[in-house]
């Protein structure tokens, strides 16, 4: 199965996040996360993945915009999101 043909937004985000988080191919990871967001645009996890991808690309402005909105919406109870928030907050 070609990964590009996977139609499940859950798997698209998961695969994208793995590519991003492990610095395998951040650009490609963001592409997969954006595909997932097309199907679930309000997903907290998918938006967090996208913010993390932008952070990994040193696009601090985009990362901060997304992560601040998430913090305002749901707070920082999720440990993974809090880790991302703390790192992105320091991004320059």
Map each language-model feature to its residues.
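Short coil turns that delineate tetratricopeptide repeat
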Residues: 5-7, 41, 75-76
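Structural motif corresponding to the intra-repeat A-B loop/turn of tetratricopeptide repeats
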Residues: 22-23, 57, 92
């Amino acid at each position: 199965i070609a990964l590009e043909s996977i139609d499940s937004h859950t798997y698209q985000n998961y695969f994208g996040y793995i590519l991003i988080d492990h610095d395998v191919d951040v650009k490609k990871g963001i592409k997969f996360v954006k595909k997932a967001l097309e199907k679930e645009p309000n997903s907290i996890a998918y938006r967090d993945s996208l913010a993390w991808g932008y952070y990994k690309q040193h696009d601090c402005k985009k990362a901060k915009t997304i992560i601040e909105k998430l913090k305002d919406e749901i707070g920082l109870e999720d440990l993974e999101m809090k880790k991302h928030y703390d790192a992105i907050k320091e991004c320059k």
